[in-house]
């Protein structure tokens, strides 16, 4: 990679600002004997009367050990959308800079670009849903700050070619964000093991999918310590509440991740085999995620028929390259069997 310098990317007002700090940010170790008269809290204990740990030390410590990474290379957010928004706000100058996204893909990249007044350059994936590297490189200019890669991709379900990702990491002097929300369901490994090799690499993951904690809203961003330090300047001080931190840590310690992932992957295989025999399904796309994208002869019709039967899936027909496509999340064995029964009866 040529001439990457994070100081050339960060917004000037962010570069020079001082982060908000609570008094407790100054303490690395707390004891039960400490008296807290710093934050104007209600002193009467009910289990939630105190502000949460702004640094999420226990939760970060567990995740750091699990992923063999330093805590200063990690940022936790109120869902992945918060950490993605922080990346926009730290590095993209409104009404000046641009980002590149690769439709069909996760819609929040475009939404966050609009919220932050950043031009979103859309470079369509190829017919087999892979990054069109030549077109991406053509669209990069001096104001391009970020390229977003969702791999495994939502809604298509496939993982991106390693060589394509490496080409961008090595040739783009901006930030490459790889969204790995579905990585635990993929036969491909995470890019986390090379996070220290590429200072322009950011990886987002989540506890919402494989870890079954969508209700807690905890997203994770991994990057260099320099990038994390910048993002910590603008992170709200108490962005993850006590209940979420404690519940997440408890569930991680009792993790049934491998068991659930294996069941979902097995159900995914069974779902594909069942869908093959349904006449109006024209194509079943390969999936590395916990969902399957299918092409049917009339997506609106089939979507509405399923709604009438009390089954909610996602109609992705409004996405580029996804005409008449439906996205089906892999559910429990019973839910999947009900879906197949209804589809066969349509």
UniProtKB/Swiss-Prot annotation:
Matching Pfam families: Aminotran_1_2 (PF00155)
Cofactor(s) of this protein: pyridoxal 5'-phosphate
Catalytic activity field: L-histidinol phosphate + 2-oxoglutarate = 3-(imidazol-4-yl)-2-oxopropyl phosphate + L-glutamate
Gene Ontology terms, MF aspect: histidinol-phosphate transaminase activity; pyridoxal phosphate binding
InterPro entries the UniProt entry points to: Aminotrans_II_pyridoxalP_BS (IPR001917), Aminotransferase_I/II_large (IPR004839), HisP_aminotrans (IPR005861), PyrdxlP-dep_Trfase (IPR015424), PyrdxlP-dep_Trfase_major (IPR015421), PyrdxlP-dep_Trfase_small (IPR015422)
PROSITE patterns associated with the record: AA_TRANSFER_CLASS_2 (PS00599)
Listed Gene3D superfamilies: Aspartate Aminotransferase, domain 1 (3.90.1150.10), Type I PLP-dependent aspartate aminotransferase-like (Major domain) (3.40.640.10)
Leader sequence segment: none
Pathway info: Amino-acid biosynthesis; L-histidine biosynthesis; L-histidine from 5-phospho-alpha-D-ribose 1-diphosphate: step 7/9
Keyword entries, A-Z: Amino-acid biosynthesis, Aminotransferase, Histidine biosynthesis, Pyridoxal phosphate, Transferase
Domain of life: Bacteria
GO BP terms in the entry: L-histidine biosynthetic process
CDD domains the record matches: AAT_like
Positions carrying N6-(pyridoxal phosphate)lysine: 209
Enzyme Commission numbers on file: 2.6.1.9
Family: Belongs to the class-II pyridoxal-phosphate-dependent aminotransferase family. Histidinol-phosphate aminotransferase subfamily.
Quaternary structure note: Homodimer.
Protein name stated in the entry: Histidinol-phosphate aminotransferase
């Amino acid at each position: 990679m040529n001439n990457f310098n994070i100081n050339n990317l960060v917004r000037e007002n962010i570069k020079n600002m001082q982060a908000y700090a609570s008094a407790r940010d100054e303490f690395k170790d707390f004891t039960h004997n400490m008296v807290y008269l710093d934050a104007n809290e209600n002193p009467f204990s009910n289990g939630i009367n105190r502000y949460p740990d702004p640094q999420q030390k226990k939760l970060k410590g567990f995740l750091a050990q699990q992923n063999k990474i330093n805590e200063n290379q990690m940022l936790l957010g109120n869902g992945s959308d918060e950490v993605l928004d922080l990346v926009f706000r730290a590095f993209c100058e409104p009404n000046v800079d641009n980002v590149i996204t690769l439709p069909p893909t996760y819609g929040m990249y475009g939404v966050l670009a609009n919220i932050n007044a950043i031009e979103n350059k859309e470079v369509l994936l190829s017919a087999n849903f892979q990054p069109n590297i030549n077109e991406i490189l053509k669209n990069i200019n001096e104001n391009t700050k970020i390229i977003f890669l969702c791999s495994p991709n939502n809604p298509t379900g496939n993982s991106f070619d390693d060589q394509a990702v490496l080409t961008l990491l090595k040739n783009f002097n901006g930030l490459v964000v790889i969204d790995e929300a579905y990585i635990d369901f993929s036969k491909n490994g995470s890019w986390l093991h090379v996070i220290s090799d590429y200072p322009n690499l950011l990886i987002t993951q989540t506890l919402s999918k494989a870890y079954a904690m969508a209700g807690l809203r905890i997203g994770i961003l991994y990057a260099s310590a320099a990038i994390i330090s910048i993002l910590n300047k603008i992170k709200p001080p108490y962005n993850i509440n006590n209940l979420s931190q404690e519940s997440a840590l408890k569930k991680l310690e009792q993790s049934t991740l491998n068991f659930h992932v294996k069941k979902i992957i097995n159900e995914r295989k069974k779902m594909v085999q069942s869908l093959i025999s349904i006449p109006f399904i024209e194509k079943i796309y390969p999936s590395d995620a916990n969902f399957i994208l299918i092409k049917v002869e009339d997506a609106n019709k089939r979507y509405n028929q399923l709604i009438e039967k009390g089954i909610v899936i996602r109609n992705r027909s409004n996405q580029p390259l996804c005409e008449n496509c439906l996205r089906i999340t892999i559910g429990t064995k019973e839910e999947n069997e009900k879906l197949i029964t209804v589809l066969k009866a349509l």
